[in-house]
Amino acid sequence: MQLKRVAEAKLPTPWGDFLMVGFEELATGHDHVALVYGDISGHTPVLARVHSECLTGDALFSLRCDCGFQLEAALTQIAEEGRGILLYHRQEGRNIGLLNKIRAYALQDQGYDTVEANHQLGFAADERDFTLCADMFKLLGVNEVRLLTNNPKKVEILTEAGINIIERVPLIVGRNPNNEHYLDTKAEKMGHLLNK
């Protein structure tokens, strides 16, 4: 186990009341959060979203990505379902950090795509570690999920880490003229499933 569960509190939102659960990485002290809606116990697979932190999309309403749209759509679907989990994975910019993400944006403004920009900065296309999320699910007592994602690599890594993904639920929202190239690159170079 790479994490420990350290704190929890009620979090009222426009979608209803969630239980916010805080986790701390044992090796680094970095924190991550789960938002739990309704009763997630039992044997029925839970609707879940692993959402990687995106300050620009989630809090600053950037149209360069689909992250903020996905966050809102996931919370809406979880609330409509009556139970579910959103893991807020604190690995900004596919885990290159906020300042490097801004540098990557500047490279994209010069014509590089999102993958090329990461490579120009010395990073892989995706630096995230989703095994942390498998540990978060396990600490919440959940082993079977219906995962809201367009990323087959996320499904693969969580499955290898012991989470039974019963169904991949597409989450295709937020395409606009500002992020079309970004989304097309994610589909073409990173294998994201954005046409279903």
Curated annotation (Swiss-Prot):
Any one GO biological process: riboflavin biosynthetic process
GO molecular function: GTP binding; GTP cyclohydrolase II activity; zinc ion binding
Active site residues according to the UniProt entry: D126, R128
GO (cellular component) term, any one: cytosol
Cross-referenced Pfam families: GTP_cyclohydro2 (PF00925)
Cofactor(s) the protein needs: Zn(2+)
Keywords: GTP-binding, Hydrolase, Metal-binding, Nucleotide-binding, Riboflavin biosynthesis, Zinc
EC number, as in UniProt: 3.5.4.25
Binding-site positions, Zn(2+): C54, C65, C67
Catalysed reactions listed for this entry: GTP + 4 H2O = 2,5-diamino-6-hydroxy-4-(5-phosphoribosylamino)-pyrimidine + formate + 2 phosphate + 3 H(+)
Pathway in which this enzyme or protein is active: Cofactor biosynthesis; riboflavin biosynthesis; 5-amino-6-(D-ribitylamino)uracil from GTP: step 1/4
List of residues binding GTP: R49, V50, H51, S52, E53, Q70, E92, G93, R94, T114, T149, K154
Cofactor comment text: Binds 1 zinc ion per subunit.
Function summary: Catalyzes the conversion of GTP to 2,5-diamino-6-ribosylamino-4(3H)-pyrimidinone 5'-phosphate (DARP), formate and pyrophosphate.
Quaternary structure note: Homodimer.
Record-stated family: Belongs to the GTP cyclohydrolase II family.
Name used for this protein in its record: GTP cyclohydrolase-2
Source organism (scientific name): Escherichia coli O45:K1 (strain S88 / ExPEC)
Lineage, highest ranks first: Bacteria, Pseudomonadati, Pseudomonadota, Gammaproteobacteria, Enterobacterales
